[in-house]
Amino acid sequence: MIFKEILEINGLNVTNMKKQFFATIIGLSITLNGLAYLGPNDKKGGGDETPKGANCSPATAKLTMEFNDVSAFIEQGGSMLQNRQEGTPAYEVPKGSNLFAIYAGALWMGGTDVNGQLKLAALRYRSGNDFWAGPLTVNPGTGDYNPLYPVGDGVRRDFGEANIDPDQCQAYDKFYTIRKAEVVAFNIWFECNAGIATEGCDDIEAPSNDVLKRIYGWPAHGDVSRGQDYFLAPYYDRDEDGNYNPDNGDHPWYDDILGRDDVLCQVDRRVTLYGDETHWWVFNDKGNIHTETTGDPIGMEIRAQAFSFATNDEVNLMTFYNYELINRGTQTLYDTYFSQYLDCDIGNYSDDYVGCDVSRGLGYTYNGDLVDQSDGGTNGYGENPPAIGCDFFEGPYQDADGLDNPGPYLDSITNEMVIPEISDAINNNGIVYNGIGTGYSDDLIDNE
């Protein structure tokens, strides 16, 4: 495994930068499941199987995130931030300004099988397709994951043939949108109606039909008769019966509402919902032949979230993305890389530069001079143009090694940061920068 977890960054120094904003593509948090599993078919010569039922049509669902001061275009089939139909950028910030900071983006992933054969799924401008809508098939009981209980590093998700039929690709070619405020209001209304709460119930209104439709239509479960994982989108199971039923108070799962803190991030790897507004969808790399990269499929199921917050600070100019990557096949993926591909264009694309802040794990794009001119129909940002950054807040967990890997930590006695030696960090899979990982030198083993 290659990625290390990345901490939230504070952004570039924007002091004295008049009329500037700093927009950041964030979230890019990734949870991996099952990539270290050696399946029963993971043997020499086992990497050339022809996918069954892999004849899906390209995904067509689209949406525009515009909950805060960013307008960001997302497609179900893995591409993002680009209007492919018009060949124009589609990450507008500030919203409504007709100024764009990103031309295109996508998720990239790849690795090798036991024979050293490359498995690859990626997009640039989506001239072809490497991703299709929907969850992949599994053999129930091959894993030990149960979302009712905290999940550690040893958990394994169900795996199997990792296939999908065209009608299921079509059925999941959509986004599921929910807002945290809607879930909070539903909780309060339910508890008042059920007699669980009595105070403050006099003025409680029932959720609208639209809100109830989103909550009752939440894709909490896959179709096990089609070989899908029973547990799909995150949901809060109020009565802990393992089944999603809003009549019993179940709802899409934000774990930080109403004083709850259901998931301790340092030790619990369950994925909940994030943001004030959340768009959830599921896609895969097995629905058909890879025509963008021509790479061999992995058998990866990707559960994605695009989310944002409405605030009065810089976060109002940011968007966030979370990917839960689940290897549904029986083959282990080695030497694995994941990346967020971005083609950033700060207004006029002809005068931009890219850079990397190593200590923060931050990649950024900025204008080459102090004025971003308009050119050839592309609007420039003018004087004091902005920069835009891309950061992994949380990357994949490191492979378990039985160590609390070394990293910077705050000495409780001296109140000073203690930085490990570079040689110690290298030899023990640690880090030397405080901004590029979590779980290091925290007295907990294998949570890095």
PLM features: what roles do these ranges have?
Residues 37-448:
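A long-range scaffold signal marking pre-active-site subdomains of enzyme folds
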Residues 1-41:
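Bacterial Sec-dependent N-terminal signal peptides
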